[in-house]
Amino acid sequence: MRASRCCWETAPVHEARVSDGVSIAYETFGDPGDPPVLLVMGFGAQMIAWHEDFCAMLAGGGRYVIRYDNRDCGLSTRFHDHPVDMSRFIAAVSGGDIPAAQAMIPYSLRDMAGDGMGLLTALGIEKAHIVGSSMGGMIAQTMAITQPARVLTLTSMMSSTGEPDYGQAAPAAQQALFSPSPPDRQGYIDASEKELAWSSRRYANAGAIRELAARSYDRAYYPAGIGRQLGAMILAGSRADALKTLNVPTLVIHGLDDTLVDPSGGKRTAELIPGARLLLVPDMGHDRPRELWQDLCDAIEAHTRFA
């Protein structure tokens, strides 16, 4: 397998080689001597979706915060040589031909979890607190399942277990998620307002959505990776049995207004993981509005305080 890495960027970032052929772009906030917190972003989103002010707020609470681009996104390694025909992929999955579907996707959710662990290794960090959002929550769960000794605590935000009966999207949110965005900059920014379909209704902010879309487009527009990430997520299957045996202190955070991953996904996650605490946030959708940052940081800081 040959992968290629983006070689241009609009702002300096650090880069770490985490495995053969895969490099991960990352940024850090705070004092390296503080307890490390690894932030794992979701489907198709760059690390800047963890806003730098949010990261600084978390770091201000005495945490060494690390955010990074998942593979096939942002400034991390891109898998140009593996184009995916999503129609064929979906047909294979729907028809039960999982081996054929797997052959179309060059990596798995486990590989993506390995990237995060590899980044910690490259930074000389043996153990860390892991915080994952949406698909990032699935990746974070996988980190805790596959390498529990390296996970001090797990925080799974607006995510689910991979079971089909939990965490399903509302039809309008699902339609918005999979509606194609124009390839030109202005069209992409305008189309980003579709995210209002799953945003926190009370704090809905089209301006903030458009600002992130513009920054993401200018930093590293790369829609080709989305299909491969989606394939890895679909093929990951259920983590239910593994979560039942997890022995990692876990906090599950889910917005009660989430229409992209129904709150049943968070409730089910907390139900399965022994000793997990569940924080259901009123007025929060499938996003992290600035108005809730302090509450979210306080919850993460409290959860990571004693591990």
Question: Language-model segments: which ranges?
Answer:
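Acidic catalytic loop of the alpha/beta-hydrolase fold
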Residues: 257-261
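Conserved HGGG/HGGXW glycine-rich cap/lid loop of the alpha/beta-hydrolase fold
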Residues: 20-99
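Short beta-strand/loop motif that positions the catalytic acidic residue
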Residues: 246, 252-254
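Flexible "cap/lid" loop of the alpha/beta hydrolase fold
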Residues: 145, 154-183
